[in-house]
Amino acid sequence: MTDNNPQWERDLIAKLASTALSEQRRARRWGIFFKLLTFAYLTFILVIAVDWKSRGETGAGGKKHTAMVEVSGIIAPGSDASADRVMSALQEAFKDKNTKGVVVRCNSPGGSPVQAQAIYDEMRRLRKKHPEIPLYAVVDDVCASGGYFVAVGADRIFVAKASVVGSIGVLMNGFGFTGLMEKLGVERRLITAGENKGMLDPFSPMDEKDVVHARQLMADIHQQFIGVVKEGRGKRLKEAPEIFSGLIWTGQKSVELGLADGIGSLESVARDVVEAEDIVDFSARESVVERFARRFGASAASALVESAMRNSALGIR
């Protein structure tokens, strides 16, 4: 009995030491976590303050300026060129008391016809609401398809000589995998309620009546596009059937065809046309706060999960 006491005491001391060490490690981890959380919180507050200050300075002062709104990239929901972002920016630009003219800076290959139509309609509405503020479009590299749909909502369109302009048409594309499926011995099993619900299914043979319907669908949208272009350009548009064929042209050729009004850049239009050299960017991009919140949210979630897993593992031991 006496010989076993020292061993029992040593085991107890070892367990106590191990438990204390585990608690110390756990406390250290949580301490680091809360320090990082505090740092992130303070950084977030600082970012909000900086972002608020920069927003407050937009359009500040009593000097007249040219308001610029960018339509850059694919016009689609959730993008910087989405209807929500562009329309919001246009509203702010027209609302600013120091705005002398608004320039939509286009650099887009197109996108959703629904989004483009919404932006176009808002441009026309704001122009009618603020008749004293002219609205221009300036093309950088490319203004095609839905991008041009948006541009024709402006009073005048200015391009660079080498800009790519046009593509007034509608596109629907996809792939067919039936040949590959036959080689692999894969059978397609498609069950629908509604005989046309599986129209243009890439894993089923092409049905001619589906193609006819799809062409009619695109033709309807194409006619809407043509109507918008004719409404926006009016008599400036030359009588040339190829204009609506989906072709693209250089900026210089687009002026000859009446698709654009002249050669110019953002700076030259602000200086010579609007006659307000100061350019204020009203583009509604993802803010610093939104970007930080999105990234921090993902990082914080990852840290919490990792911490929970570690603590759970310590508890099992």
Model-derived regions, located:
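N-terminal organellar transit peptides
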Residues: 1-137, 141-160, 171-317
